[in-house]
Amino acid sequence: DPFVTEKSQIEIEKAVRNMGYMRAKVHLNTETKKNKLKVNYLIEAGQPYTVKHIAYNIDDMVINDYIEKDSANSYLHEGMPFDVSVLDNERNRITKLLQNNGYYKFNKDFLVYQADTVKNTFQVNLTMKLLPFQLRKEDVPTRHKQYTIRNVNFLTQDNLFLQGNSLEEYDSIHHEGLRIFYKDNLYLRPNVLADFNYIQPQKLYREQDVQNTYTSMGRLRALKYTNINFSEINQNDSTQLDANVLMTKGKNQSLSFEIEGTNSAGDLGAAASMTFQHRNVFKGSETFT
């Protein structure tokens, strides 16, 4: 297929150039032998471009300070190949750094590069720029907000918000800074939820805390799954978030029946083995067998 062949040629050339070989060319050579077509792609890489100088244009003193203090972990350094994948890894690294320091709405698209080639050389001067926060094109650009957690709410009914119910309609317990809302029966002890939670009230939002909570809650066998979302207190000017941990209860009981082959004193027979499990008998998500 000539279209597929040409498309592959373009993709290979693009990949090689993204590795820093900016003047690379890919030549196509085809051979027909015994009704079979053999395609060879010949890469003329040329000399790779390297980064001569790195600069940062970060028009936010707080964010600039975070980047500078963590510069020892940067993937960028002068003399490195001008490799697009490394540049993207650096954007991901800084994004993760900021998301773990309160920047709940930050993503890597707010970081862009400007690369200027140095005349008569195979070098580029690289500048990383920070774009202002802008959710939609028609929005006025603003500074990036640093969010703190106001409340951490544990909700034992995962469809509570979907039904349009108010939190006031549910029983609640306050435990170690957490607000636990339930109806009819609280099937997990408050201290268990506190022990498995990493999101802390009055602290900066940290994406790692969210992931750690997902991992930790996933070990509670009393739960089928957990969903965590965040709501802004005031979308216009607030920098506070409420964390909502929505829990879906798993089935408490299971019954399994196994047939085991036995061979005692030369007699081949069968023995029945029955196992009964209650996954939350003590409301601590224990398994009782």
Locations of regions flagged by a protein language model:
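Periplasmic polypeptide-binding modules associated with outer-membrane biogenesis and secretion
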Residues: 1-263, 271, 275, 285
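Residue-level signature of outer-membrane beta-barrel architecture
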Residues: 278-280
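Short, intrinsically disordered, charge-balanced linker/junction segments flanking boundaries
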Residues: 287-289
